[in-house]
């Protein structure tokens, strides 16, 4: 549905050259909710603006629904752009227009007949839960209601793609949750492919299927949300994950663990998914295999509809441990593990 191939973007300002994107390549599948996360200046907003041609590439290809959009002239892009909706952090509503007129604006600009406009606007306002607000003005609405108007406006042309650039950053936690639930419903009901730009890992955790982590204009890590949360590879990804899930003990606790550790012990970190949590792992290790094991740390969390668990175990190097192949035991059960050095 959306594909970036070796995309580079360079901004030139007087004597200064800034490379905002560096050889970015990945694909977003149809009907996917794909998150792009990174700190300020990572290049994520520049990336999303390439999809609807608010920016153009310096080098590389951006392919949208089979069209290499950078090769099209503006007049030929119009039909493609009709299939792309976008919502922003600050809503971008027309304060002088009613809620109804704001939602209707894309249809008015495309010279849609009044009957069809009314049908589509009423449908979208009902869908986002604002049918009773259609005659009000943006200044009379809360932040969450304004974003619902923006979502209705973006969807009124029934696009295939919805771009969300920091769409929840200006909202409080409860309102953010309701907007994310609405976007998830958009994806399920209309099959819209969503590209979600954010700096909040809680947004990725709640709604996205897959995620790309960006830093300094590059994609440094990518995978399913479950994979990135369970086994982040880069320090940036680890830092983002740690903002919403305690995957390991604090530095103070780790220092305490290490002060009591010697060569007679080995520590392992384990990640268990919702099915593996049901396995009697500790019971088997202790009672069947007679290992001397202590639980130093454990944490459970929700990743979308799945419960996951993080364990930090310490094993004593006694005769039972030396005779037991722990890594084989874990691998046979498809349990992810990491020896803590």
Swiss-Prot record:
It is an enzyme of class 7 (translocase). Its EC number is 7.4.2.11. GO terms for cellular component: plasma membrane. ATP binds at residues 38-45. Residues 2-241 form the ABC transporter domain. It catalyses: L-methionine(out) + ATP + H2O = L-methionine(in) + ADP + phosphate + H(+); D-methionine(out) + ATP + H2O = D-methionine(in) + ADP + phosphate + H(+). Keywords: Amino-acid transport, ATP-binding, Cell membrane, Membrane, Nucleotide-binding, Translocase, Transport. It is found in: Cell membrane. It is a peripheral membrane protein. It comes from the Bacteria. GO terms for molecular function: ABC-type D-methionine transporter activity; ATP binding; ATP hydrolysis activity. Part of the ABC transporter complex MetNIQ involved in methionine import. Responsible for energy coupling to the transport system. The complex is composed of two ATP-binding proteins (MetN), two transmembrane proteins (MetI) and a solute-binding protein (MetQ). PANTHER family: AMINO ACID IMPORT ATP-BINDING PROTEIN (PTHR43166), METHIONINE IMPORT ATP-BINDING PROTEIN METN (PTHR43166:SF30). Belongs to the ABC transporter superfamily. Methionine importer (TC 3.A.1.24) family. This is Methionine import ATP-binding protein MetN 1.
């Amino acid at each position: 549905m959306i594909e970036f191939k070796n995309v580079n973007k360079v901004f030139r300002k007087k004597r200064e050259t800034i490379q905002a994107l560096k050889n970015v390549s990945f694909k977003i599948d149809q009907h996917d909710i794909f998150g792009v996360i990174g700190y300020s200046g990572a290049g994520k907003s520049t990336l999303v603006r390439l999809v609807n041609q608010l920016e153009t590439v310096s080098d590389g290809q951006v392919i949208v629904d089979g069209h290499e959009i950078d090769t099209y002239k503006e007049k030929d892009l119009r039909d493609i752009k009709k299939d792309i909706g976008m919502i922003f952090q600050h809503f971008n509503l027309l304060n002088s227009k009613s809620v109804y007129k704001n939602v209707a604006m894309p249809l008015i600009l495309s010279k849609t007949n009044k009957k069809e406009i009314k049908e589509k606007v009423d449908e979208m306002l009902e869908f986002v839960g604002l049918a009773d607000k259609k005659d009000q003005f943006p200044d009379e609405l809360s932040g969450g209601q304004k974003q619902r108007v923006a979502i209705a406006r973006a969807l009124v042309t029934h696009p295939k793609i919805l771009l969300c650039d920091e769409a929840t950053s200006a909202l409080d936690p409860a309102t953010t949750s309701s907007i994310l639930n609405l976007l998830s419903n958009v994806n399920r009901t209309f099959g819209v492919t969503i590209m979600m730009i954010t700096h909040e890992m809680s947004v990725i955790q709640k709604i996205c299927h897959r995620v790309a982590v960006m830093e300094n204009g590059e994609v440094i890590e990518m995978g399913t949300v479950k994979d990135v949360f369970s086994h982040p590879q880069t320090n940036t990804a680890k830092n983002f994950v740690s903002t919403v899930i305690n995957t390991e003990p604090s530095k103070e606790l780790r220092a305490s663990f290490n002060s009591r550790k010697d060569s007679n012990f080995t520590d392992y970190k384990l990640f268990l998914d919702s099915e593996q949590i049901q396995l009697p792992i500790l019971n088997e290790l202790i009672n069947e295999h007679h290992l001397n094991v202590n639980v130093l740390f454990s944490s459970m969390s929700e990743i979308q509809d799945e419960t996951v668990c993080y364990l930090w175990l310490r094993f004593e190097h006694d005769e039972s441990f030396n005779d037991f192949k722990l890594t084989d035991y874990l691998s046979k059960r498809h349990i992810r593990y990491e020896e803590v050095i």
